Amino acid sequence: MQQEIIQVTGVKPVIDAEEEIKQRVQFLKEYLVHTGAKGLVLGISGGQDSSLAGRLCQIAVEELRSETNRDYQFYAVRLPYGQQQDESDAQLALSFIRPDHALRVDIKPAVAASMASFEQATGDVLSDFSKGNTKARERMKVQYDIAAHYGCLVVGTDHAAEFVTGFYTKHGDGACDLTPLTGLNKRQGKQLLRQLQAPEGLIEKVPTADLEDNQPGLPDEQALGMTYNEIDDYLEGKTISAESQAKLEAQYKRVGHKHHMPVSPLDTWWK
């Protein structure tokens, strides 16, 4: 199964960071022109993935403005849930990205309204885990509102390590128009950030989805039960422990529904 997953994710065992940056910027430019959209929108958390995707987006629109004389724009959106504990990291990311526009929308009131509506309708309280997914979906809703208003595309940060584990919210951070980090694993993303001269604090920041109130700042690796180094090694075709391989492959099968459009009677992938 390892070779099948490597083929699906498109991860290369070795990359040229400079060349990968060029190719991914070119992809953003070509698709933006193809669609006729006026720019790009991306949520910025202060983590590795959005920092990298954000910088690629800004480079892409700057190059397009120079090449086409059209006013393409990039909107970087801060989407905190109330007061974000690592706000300084988010500000550091914005300083690195240098976006055309930096917007801020606090999603806490909208999430609270959604929770209240659910409780009123059902008489039940949504679990903390499900509330975390509601936060992710509210963030994406806001990004699509902004994109619709300005005639832009929404950029996602999904990469190979997230894809194989399904470590994203369906119709939340998994919903977007284009994913410039596809085909990269976690350590390769770091390589691109170093090539772009990102602050070391952004590159080495402990990854966290930070969605659960009861477990704030829960590290991804703790939630996954495996390390990104193990996942990256697997995706590069290396041997990892039998236990970790079995866990990763079982997880890949379990989250298969996230890799497809809504299932229909004509589909057979799930059988």
Curated annotation (Swiss-Prot):
Class of enzymatic activity (EC top level): ligase
Protein name, per record: NH(3)-dependent NAD(+) synthetase
Binding residue positions for deamido-NAD(+): 137, 170, 177, 257-258
CDD domains cross-referenced by the UniProt entry: NAD_synthase
Stored PANTHER family: NH 3 /GLUTAMINE-DEPENDENT NAD + SYNTHETASE, NH(3)-DEPENDENT NAD(+) SYNTHETASE
Keywords attached to this entry: ATP-binding, Ligase, Magnesium, Metal-binding, NAD, Nucleotide-binding
HAMAP family with a match to the protein in the record: NadE_ammonia_dep (MF_00193)
GO terms for cellular component: cytoplasm
Entries under NCBIfam families matching the protein: nadE, PRK00768.1
Catalysed reactions listed for this entry: deamido-NAD(+) + NH4(+) + ATP = AMP + diphosphate + NAD(+) + H(+)
Sequence positions that bind ATP: 43-50, 157, 186, 208
InterPro entries in the cross-refs: NAD/GMP_synthase, NAD_synthase, NH(3)-dep_NAD(+)_synth, Rossmann-like_a/b/a_fold
Pfam families: NAD_synthase (PF02540)
Residues given in the record as Mg(2+) binding sites: 49, 162
Subunit structure: Homodimer.
Family of the protein in this entry: Belongs to the NAD synthetase family.
A single BP term in Gene Ontology: NAD biosynthetic process
Function field: Catalyzes the ATP-dependent amidation of deamido-NAD to form NAD. Uses ammonia as a nitrogen source.
Molecular function as annotated in GO: ATP binding; glutaminase activity; metal ion binding; NAD+ synthase (glutamine-hydrolyzing) activity; NAD+ synthase activity
EC number: 6.3.1.5
Protein's organism: Exiguobacterium sibiricum (strain DSM 17290 / CCUG 55495 / CIP 109462 / JCM 13490 / 255-15)
Pathway: Cofactor biosynthesis; NAD(+) biosynthesis; NAD(+) from deamido-NAD(+) (ammonia route): step 1/1
